Amino acid sequence: MSMQDPIADMLTRIRNGQAANKVAVTMPSSKLKVAIANVLKEEGYIEDFKIEGDTKPVLELELKYFQGKAVVESIQRVSRPGLRIYKRKDELPKVMAGLGIAVVSTSKGVMTDRAARQAGLGGEIICYVA
């Protein structure tokens, strides 16, 4: 059976892994998942990530905890295969009044809402992380 929304699966694995206090979670790798993982690492939501395997690459994310609590309080899919959500640069949302991030896929790559606003770019809102 094929997976309908691999990004939602990635976010669910992160959410479930942190709920179970796992050190790391693994999932099938793709360019978009690696780009999202890179944004999460730059923003301090995960410790690190690595890609293993050649024929079927596997993405492994090291989850991050602070004083025993998960750093990611909430992670929510916004744009999905059945309903894509696109926003212009002036319409980009501020998650939790700027405390969280929106991961945006732009013409210049995957970045946070703050970086997209600075670059003057809009794009597809992939998810919210707080």
From Swiss-Prot:
Keyword match rRNA-binding: yes
Protein name: Small ribosomal subunit protein uS8
Example GO biological process: translation
GO cellular component: ribonucleoprotein complex; ribosome
One MF term in the entry's GO annotations: rRNA binding
Keyword Lyase: no
PROSITE patterns: RIBOSOMAL_S8
NCBIfam families noted in UniProt: PRK00136.1
Keywords: Ribonucleoprotein, Ribosomal protein, RNA-binding, rRNA-binding
Function according to Swiss-Prot or TrEMBL: One of the primary rRNA binding proteins, it binds directly to 16S rRNA central domain where it helps coordinate assembly of the platform of the 30S subunit.
Stated family: Belongs to the universal ribosomal protein uS8 family.
HAMAP family: Ribosomal_uS8_B
Native source organism of the sequence: Pectobacterium carotovorum subsp. carotovorum (strain PC1)
Superkingdom, natural source: Bacteria
Gene3D superfamilies given in the database record: 3.30.1370.30, 3.30.1490.10
Subunit structure: Part of the 30S ribosomal subunit. Contacts proteins S5 and S12.
